[in-house]
Design a protein with these regions (language model features):
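Substrate-binding cleft of carbohydrate-active enzyme catalytic domains
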Residues: 199-220, 251-259
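Acidic, glycine-rich loop-and-beta core segments that form the ion-binding/anion-interacting portion
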Residues: 218, 225-261
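Alpha-helix-loop-beta-strand connector modules within alpha/beta enzyme cores
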Residues: 190-205, 224-234
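Distinct, well-ordered alpha-helical segments
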Residues: 51, 155-159, 220-230
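Histidine-centered catalytic micro-motifs
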Residues: 37-44, 216, 234-237
């Protein structure tokens, strides 16, 4: 380690902060703007049904806990990504399946309604070509994905229904085992995929939909990789070498994923042990309704959140740790197999990268690490578009 002499250190400290090189320079920002930047896991649709919440208005993370809106997409140079149809899992029974199906369909309708209401700034896309055309026209793009296939029940024809609605990616499972597969945080009911889950893989391949292995158990991941005729991705996962959690993947499996042409999109959750307490969940539900609170209610909520964070911070993970995770994945898998999937609006964000306005920090850091602009463009979005083309080209075979 190089140690500065006292005179040199004094000189450095005497330079005003404004005169030092900014973390994201004008050249960094220009390079960032030349790339198509996307994230594969945007949970923002949870806000689309909150009364008074406006996707077209800039919100503050400190107020309503949101991390994405159109102004912040502009600020962060986020061209688009996969807006998630998420359904919290309930009963594995006909009544539960029916309720979940209806909730998932309504979430898809909400995504399309919000996009249509902002058509001058964002459009729906189902292919890489459509996304690229939207970017060239000066607009953002919205792909759609399903997190947790529980709403399909035992009716795989619903995959085609969601495909017709524009959905182009789905994962079999979330935080609990379901009718398709074992979860990374489940009990191991099936030892991987169920018989129905194996048919789910075949139907996903037939339709040309990306298979998302995030939240899958190790056995489920192994079987997805073995059975799929097209590359699979992990839309929001990370290396187990950085944080030993079942939601992350070990290096050997990361190498196998890359060898099969797949991708790991780097998560900003599961870098450390986060506070996922019921108390925090309750406060975050109150935050989502920020726009409808009066001044006294807002002061009370802010005080309650500050008190909780003083006792038990949500995360101690910072931007440097996030980049360590990404750089580890690049070293293990290669630059052609890594991308962005930070779990925005679903628990993601780290200290120093609290919302998507901070995305230029990632491409700037990769420039500092010596990556070429072409390789950085792969990580920021190009890899996903390449794999999406491969998956869609393999449809129907």
């Amino acid at each position: 380690m190089r140690i500065l002499s006292l005179p040199a250190l004094a000189l450095l400290l005497a330079i005003p902060a404004s005169a030092r090189q900014p973390e994201v320079t004008a050249a960094d920002r220009a390079a960032h703007e030349r790339m198509i930047v996307l994230d594969t896991h945007l949970d923002t649709p949870v806000y689309f049904e909150v009364p008074g919440w406006d996707f077209a208005r800039r919100h503050l993370y400190a107020e309503d806990n949101s991390q994405i809106d159109l102004p912040r997409m502009d600020a962060g140079g986020l061209d688009g990504g996969f807006f998630v149809i998420y359904t919290a899992q309930g009963a594995l029974a006909p009544e539960g399946y029916a309720q979940a199906r209806d909730a998932a369909l309504m979430r898809a309708v909400a995504i399309q309604r919000v996009v249509a209401a902002n058509a001058a700034r964002i459009g729906l896309a189902t292919t890489p070509d459509e996304a690229e055309r939207l970017v060239r026209s000066g607009r953002h793009f919205a792909f759609q994905s399903i997190e947790n296939s529980w709403p399909l029940g035992e009716d795989l024809s619903l995959l085609a229904t969601f495909h017709r609605l524009g959905v182009r990616m789905a994962g079999p499972v979330h935080s609990r085992d379901n009718q398709f597969a074992d979860s990374a945080t489940g009990q191991g009911r099936w030892h991987g995929l169920s018989p129905l889950g194996r048919r789910w893989v075949a139907e996903m391949n037939r339709l040309g939909m990306i298979i998302d292995g995030s939240h899958s158990s190790d056995e489920t991941f192994d079987q997805l990789l073995a059975l799929s005729r097209a590359p699979i991705i992990l839309s929001h996962s990370g290396p187990r070498a950085i944080f030993n959690h079942r939601r992350n993947l070990d290096d050997a499996r990361m190498r196998r994923l890359a060898a099969a042409g797949g991708l790991m999109m780097i998560n900003s959750v599961f870098l450390v042990e986060n506070d996922l307490s019921d108390e925090r969940d309750a406060l975050q539900e109150r935050q989502k309704n920020w726009g409808n609170l009066d001044a006294a209610q807002r002061r009370r909520l802010t005080a309650d959140l500050a008190a909780l964070n003083a006792r038990r911070p949500y995360t101690t993970a910072d931007f440097d740790l996030y980049m360590r995770s990404m750089l580890h994945a690049i070293r293990v898998m290669g630059v052609d197999h890594v991308g962005l999937g930070a779990d925005w609006d679903g628990g993601g964000g780290v200290i120093g990268m609290e919302d998507i306005a901070a995305l230029p920090r990632i491409s700037a850091r990769l420039r500092r690490e010596g990556f070429s602009e072409a390789d950085i463009a792969k990580v920021m979005g190009g890899n996903l578009l390449r794999v999406m083309r491969q998956v869609q080209a393999a449809a129907g075979r």
